[in-house]
């Protein structure tokens, strides 16, 4: 990793986590970068569910997957990540990826919100199998970013440490509230 982007940092952990045949979720589809990564890692025997509420994100992701000749192992859902539990069984998902904030190049008014993000994270814990991982990139920019960041971090802090390992990192010397990477591992 030489570009020092939080998403690249998180993708290293995702690459170590996801195996051929896994079920994975991209909870915030965006422009499809994580969907493509998950699709390539879980291969033709795996499955990726990708969520976004914007048609623009779904179209951009479909184009990215088609251009990359991604395996036909994904379902793109024009749906809130707060409804992900309707699409997978409990204890069945190995990796769930969240990039909070707004769609790059999109309408900044259409950003993730603390309330629905915490709902989605609650569902993610139920869907995650033992040993599974959630990768979060928390961007505090935008109109609701600080509020969402604070809600998510407060929610993560109260998780039972016997059931979940929560690892939070941060840029220590960067100004302007850079994104915060967090990993959650389901222990039991």
Model-based region annotation:
Residues 1-22, 36, 40, 58-91:
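S-adenosyl-L-methionine
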Residues 19, 42-43, 128-130:
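Helix-to-beta-strand junctions that scaffold the AdoMet/dcAdoMet cofactor pocket
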Residues 28, 127, 131-138:
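Conserved beta-strand signature within the Rossmann-like core of class I S-adenosyl-L-methionine
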Residues 31-45:
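Conserved SAM-binding loop of SAM-dependent methyltransferases across substrates and taxa
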Residues 47-52:
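Conserved SAM-binding motif I beta-strand of class I
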Residues 98-120:
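Mobile active-site "lid"/loop adjacent to the S-adenosyl-L-methionine
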Residues 146-188:
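Class I S-adenosyl-L-methionine
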């Amino acid at each position: 990793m030489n570009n020092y982007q939080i998403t690249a940092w998180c993708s290293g952990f995702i690459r170590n986590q996801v195996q051929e045949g896994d079920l994975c979720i991209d909870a915030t589809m965006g422009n499809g970068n994580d969907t493509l990564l998950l699709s390539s890692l879980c291969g033709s025997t795996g499955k990726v569910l990708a969520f976004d509420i914007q048609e623009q994100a779904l179209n951009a992701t479909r184009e990215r997957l088609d251009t990359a000749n991604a395996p036909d192992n994904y379902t793109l859902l024009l749906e809130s990540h707060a409804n992900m539990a309707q699409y997978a069984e409990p204890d069945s998902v190995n990796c769930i990826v969240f990039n909070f904030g707004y769609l790059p190049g999109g309408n900044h008014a259409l950003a993730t919100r603390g309330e629905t993000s915490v709902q989605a994270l609650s569902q993610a814990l139920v869907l995650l199998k033992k040993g599974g991982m959630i990768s979060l990139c928390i961007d505090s920019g935008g109109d609701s970013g600080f509020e969402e960041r604070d809600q998510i971090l407060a929610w993560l802090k109260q998780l039972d440490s016997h059931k979940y390992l929560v690892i939070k990192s941060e840029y220590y010397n960067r100004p302007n509230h850079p994104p915060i990477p967090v990993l959650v591992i389901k222990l039991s």
